[in-house]
Design a protein with these regions (language model features):
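Conserved "HGTGT" condensation-loop signature of ketosynthase/thiolase-family condensing enzymes
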Residues: 1-156, 177-180, 196, 201-225, ...
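Internal active-site segments that recognize and position negatively charged phosphoryl groups
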Residues: 174, 573
Length: 750
């Protein structure tokens, strides 16, 4: 394993928001005391007057200024603006198409990871209005990201994760983890959220939107304003950057991720999850007793968030908080959702480069409520900043923080990455065992709940969860929680062990019923309409949020979405998280609910089959071998390895090649793939023929005669584990990617 604890660096930082499309441009505007929260014509919907002749509210938000695309001329702004930021970052890091191809031929392993709150939701709105299949097909995040990466020379895809508004910082942590695991050499961490009616209406119906200027940490703060943002970073080892002549903008010193396990839309008042994330991120400063020279707070200007965040900062720094300058950038650019942490980190890097820290707008901290807060206001503050932190908090209690050091500093300090002690105590990659499994799928031959759809009987879920807590939840959320409960029961975990678990949830479609209900209502009745519960249950990280809330998870939790292989991707990210020592155990869930519109779209796209669609969920408890041994647990199986492969080009041939590589990454005695009757099954068959003989063993498809999205691969993994044999589960995605899991049952000798 190549060492990375001695240094990970950022060699590019591109950002785009309402104040500009370069970090130095954004900073310059902030230093001139500019804000850019005004009319937002890019929001698709309109307000409807409550009565004839009644005034209609103005749509005010912070969108990226309209301009002609330089690259990536595609159907919608997400792909267009994301492509521009990606190309900007690659140019800054001296990574043109030819250079990337040369480095790949020399063995450099590139990966891209994406973070977002709402992904391709704008395409869903367009499709609901125009009925065009092209619009609806672009809804999945894998399609958005593939388009944005076109022409770069990089593989056309990457896992899309969501920790709601903590996605930007979480994406950087995932990128760094891939390098710590020595499974990649250069990561592009991308975070984005286009301005959208779905987000605007959602925050409006939750009554979180301010009518006036944003006033963070003040006594009269009244709410947030929606923004739009894109942030792209290049992450690599310090030694690799030096060898290729790249200039480090900053060094990553640490990061932290946690969960409140408190409430879906309100932070824990004591800020406990955020405090844990901040403490973990800033551990590198502890030996020298230094403090960050600047903190970019999450600071949404909502009463509950600002109070909870102050509690977290106070818990993390104590009385020394008064010596830490804090800024609140959303007061100038709105809340850019999944891109917030990334855009704000890019601005912080510009501030470090220019030795000028931007102040919050419209704000002087309420001294009575926030007595130790040094909030920058009424002008920028000059001075060298060598260490800075960014804090991000999201729906469902997702908390994340990151600490960076200036690229040029006279007195660098050693980084302290999560799991550093565990990595230092072992020279070998630790075995990851499966200690628990929960499966919820309909029985074969069950009566359909709708034409072509199979569902679980309600009694399959009865008694597993708090009936009152789940009564109004989306079916998807109930499935995630129930499967997770079954898995931890099977693993024999106590409450304390469960709280310490990380959580990773994979899904292709999430909660389509509530999502479609909310969207159709706002299209019909205007931006002021919408059920707040339906909005909250529609965000892409709802699975991991409900897993945390339902089971009480307090470590990192996030969702992976938009692909058939999302369950495999969740297992893959969890394995890396465990093998780098960041946590002792993790709960991984794949879940899907059914909906007739989803079935119709898949059929019209040629991705469906005559097999019925089924709802369901599968959950695993993954543990480091040392953790399982220390608590006296019993292994049910082993996650030997995992792989996620993205194609170099589009088309069926590229999909087949991705799957061939995924199979080769985990070659074993048997390979299991999708049902033969499906498009994915046919791609699997082509890949198996292309792969050639595997030697001893068999190859075949999942025997259950139904389709269930991201649940299928994990259901196959559960079958292999329970058989006591060893095998590879290999699955293609319609966007061209492929994933594999190598599973070994406890009775297997191979």
């Amino acid at each position: 394993v190549r060492a990375a604890d001695d240094g990970l660096v950022l060699t590019a930082a591109a950002a785009s928001c309402s104040l500009g499309e370069h970090r130095s441009e954004i900073l310059a505007a902030m230093l001139e005391d500019q804000t850019a929260i005004d009319e937002a014509p890019a929001i698709e919907g309109v307000f409807v007057a409550e009565s004839p002749g009644a005034p209609v509210p103005m749509i005010r938000a912070a969108q990226v200024p309209e301009s002609e695309p330089k690259v990536g001329a595609v159907a919608d702004r997400a792909e267009k603006l994301l492509s521009r930021s990606i190309h900007q970052a690659l140019a800054e890091a001296s990574l043109d198409h030819q250079t990337i191809e040369r480095m790949q031929s020399e063995g450099t392993r590139f990966e891209t990871v994406f973070g977002t709150t709402l992904g391709g939701m704008r395409h869903l709105g367009a499709g609901l209005r125009n009925g065009r299949l092209e619009s609806l097909s672009r809804t999945t995040t894998a399609t958005v990201t593939r388009t944005a990466l076109a022409g770069t020379g990089l593989p056309l895809g990457g896992s899309t994760v969501s920790a709601a508004c903590a996605s930007g910082v979480s994406t950087l942590a995932i990128a760094a983890t891939a390098i710590l695991a020595d499974e990649a050499d250069l990561l592009m961490a991308v975070s984005y959220d286009p301005i959208s009616e779905f987000a605007f209406a959602g925050f409006t119906c939750l009554r979180l939107v301010s009518e006036g200027p944003l006033r963070p940490f003040t006594a009269d703060r009244a709410g947030m304003r929606l923004g739009e943002g894109y942030g792209v970073f290049i992450v690599e080892r310090a030694g690799d950057a030096q060898a290729r002549g790249a200039r480090p903008l900053a060094r990553i010193l640490g990061w932290g991720g946690a969960s409140d396990a408190h409430h879906l839309t309100q932070p824990a008042p004591d800020g406990r999850g955020a405090a844990r994330a901040i403490r973990e991120a800033t551990r590198a400063l502890e030996p020298s007793q230094r403090l960050p020279g600047l903190i970019a707070a999450h600071a949404t200007s909502t009463p509950a968030n600002d109070a909870a965040e102050y509690s977290a900062l106070s818990a993390a720094f104590g009385g020394r908080l008064r010596d830490v300058p804090v800024t609140a950038l959303k007061s100038r650019i709105g809340h850019t959702l999944g891109a917030a942490g990334a855009v704000e980190l890019a601005v912080v890097l510009a501030a470090m480069e220019q030795s000028k820290s931007p102040a919050a707008a419209n704000a002087e901290a309420d001294g009575e409520s926030f007595p130790d807060l040094d909030l920058l206001h009424e002008g920028s503050r000059a001075g060298c900043v060598e260490h800075a932190a960014v804090v991000s908090l999201g729906f469902g209690g997702a908390d994340a923080a990151i600490l960076v050091e200036a690229g040029e500093t006279s007195d660098p300090i050693p980084p302290h990455f999560p799991g550093q002690a565990a990595r230092a105590s072992s020279t070998q990659r630790e075995t990851i065992l499966i200690s628990g499994c929960g499966v919820l799928v309909p029985e074969v031959g069950k009566t359909p709940v709708r034409v072509g759809e199979l569902g679980l009987d309600d009694d399959a879920l009865d008694g597993l969860d708090d009936a009152r807590a789940v009564r109004r939840l989306a079916r998807f959320s109930r499935l995630v929680r129930a499967a997770g409960i079954l898995a931890v029961q099977d693993a024999g975990l106590d409450d304390q062990e469960i709280r310490a678990c990380a959580g990773f949830v994979g899904t292709r479609f999430g909660a389509p019923e509530y999502t479609l209900d909310f969207y159709q209502e706002l299209i019909r009745d205007g931006l002021g309409a919408g059920n707040p519960l339906h909005f909250a249950e529609s965000v892409p990280n709802i699975g991991s949020a409900q897993l945390s809330l339902g089971l009480g998870l307090e470590a990192l939790t996030l969702s992976v979405g938009g692909t058939v292989i999302a369950g495999i991707e969740a297992m893959h990210l969890a394995r890396r998280h465990l093998q780098t020592g960041q946590v002792d155990r993790a709960i991984v869930v794949a879940a899907e609910e059914t909906h007739p519109m989803v079935r119709k779209i898949l059929h019209d796209l040629g991705h469906g089959s005559e097999l019925p669609n089924t709802e369901g969920a599968v959950a695993f408890v993954l543990e480091r071998e040392s953790s399982l041994r220390d608590r006296g647990g019993v292994a049910k199986g082993e996650l030997v390895d995992s792989a996620v492969i993205w194609p170099a080009s589009g088309g069926t041939h590229a999909s087949v090649e991705s799957l061939v590589r995924a199979i080769s990454e985990g070659a074993a005695q048997s390979v299991v793939g999708p049902p033969a009757e499906t498009l994915a099954g046919r791609v699997f068959g082509l890949a198996m023929r292309r792969r050639g003989p595997l030697g001893v063993g068999t190859r075949g498809s999942l025997s259950r005669p139904f389709e269930n999205g991201s649940v299928g691969p994990l259901l196959a993994a559960a079958d292999v584990m329970r058989s006591g044999q060893a095998g590879v589960i290999a699955w293609p995605d319609s966007a061209g990617g492929a994933g594999s899991l190598k599973i070994r049952g406890v009775s297997s000798e191979s």
